[in-house]
Amino acid sequence: PGLAVLPGSPVDNVARERYSTVYMPGGKITMLPDEVVQVYTLLEGRDCPALSLYLDVSRDFIVTGNESRIERVPVVANLRHHDIEPVFNETTLVEGGPDFPWKAELTLLWELATVLEAGRGTPAANQNMVDFNFSVDWNEITPDGPGKIEIGRRSRGSPLDKLVAELMIAANSTWGKALSNAGIPAL
């Protein structure tokens, strides 16, 4: 959404007041107003405005080039951690596991992420850490009032964590370098 927000505009002022998105169990307060977020959210079955980074990658997963585009991207599927991790994890990568939608694509991206991580010379610091998933079912009434809270453990450093982290690092470092080369300060 940042490309569509003009400095000093009412939306920019709201974002500056809120400063960041706040995440909490069962909800969040977005930095941008909901009507702006809804234009960019990755809802399945629609085309969303996006700043895309395309990487040219050799057969041995070496990045040989890149291209950035402002475009509309068709969202064919919105893959969620809690749906993917049971079928895409350390065990299924080693043993093969059952087929599932996007398995080949996720495996290919995981292989790229592994090479990107090795190229940085920095293994993930969170390999053996535990994280938690929180959810609140506001439709369920409990003795304490509305909202049943569920907290589940999940291991950090999973193949999906690595895939997301390494591709975000690649995007941030690629765009950071481009901004630096152009003499443009940015956060």
Set out the residue ranges of the language-model regions.
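Electropositive polyanion-binding surfaces
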Residues: 1-187
